[in-house]
Amino acid sequence: SHTMNVDVSEYIYPHEFAQELMDACGPMLPHALYDRFSDEGRTILMESFAENNAWHIRAAKYMIDKYDDWGLFYTHLHGIDLVEHWYINQAFEGAHEKWRENLETIYQMYEICDTFVAAMLPYLADGETAFFITSDHGQVPRSAGYHNPGISDLSGISCKVMSDLGYTVAHPVPNMDDVWYIDWSKTKAIQARSSYIYINLKGRDPEGIVEPEDYKELVQQIISDLYAYRDPEHGKRVVAFAMTMEEARSLGVGGEHTGDIFFQLNPDFGEEHAMAPSYVTNNGFSLISLCLMCGAGLKKGEFIKRQIKAVDVVPTICALCDVRIPANCEGGVIYQALEGFSEKEY
């Protein structure tokens, strides 16, 4: 379970608003996770998420009602993401003895979030408010009987595959289960976060050992080895594709914190999301994001057939509010969703 120090105002900005929000809405109760496959653990988890969601409703309504000069209200509900991480690999036939219960728990989390949506819908009655519901990703499970072989962890450095290939040298930390330390003096590259491999480059990285003149050749060798790597249990290729960072820019991947190699996995071995492109499906689940729009200035009952990207949401909100689109915005207005727009005229 998680806890929150209610005396620390840094959770809230502006900081002086923290006590006001606490007095009006009470503390935000985080979720409680333990023994998630037991009936008791599952019940407590869902009850805690319902409490958390109820706080979000109270806080949202308090701020919207009291500060009626607001122009944009944004909130983030993370429960669906968390619950799918915990259950989706065991939520289809053949994956777990309680797969039906696990799938129902996922649906229950959606129903909890639906109560937040229901609480916000009355604000559309003024005819001047629009409501956007979006997600940054979906999730897909690994195939039944498959396990990730040690690459593409969402939150840290994955050593197993890169150690097998000879690029990362890691040693177990004494008296700590499944905790390793890296010998940087012998490590040419590491796999960090979901989809990146970083070369331990001399002159760039604190303990770099790879000479700059060897960089390109090493990158190509690692890519070749990733394609050749086979899961030891099933004999299948683990990596779907890998490319240099220059090549990855064609996919919209880039920036100073990205790795030297970008790769994605075959969904059999995935880590729920961030390890495969958006249109990948597996076992009836998809990585495609959600986009629902309703309210002032928007069409009613329409299904938009054009491709919509997450970066298109902000320009569309700007168009509805008749404000300038940010100078470096990468997306475009979803004109097909706007009231009065007709494709036949074009």
What role is predicted for each listed range?
Residues 88-94, 146-161, 214, 259:
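Short secondary-structure boundary/capping segments
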Residues 1-96, 195-208, 214-217, 221-236:
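His/Asp/Glu-rich, glycine-adjacent segments
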Residues 72, 85-123:
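Extended hydrophobic/aromatic segments used for targeting, binding, or gating
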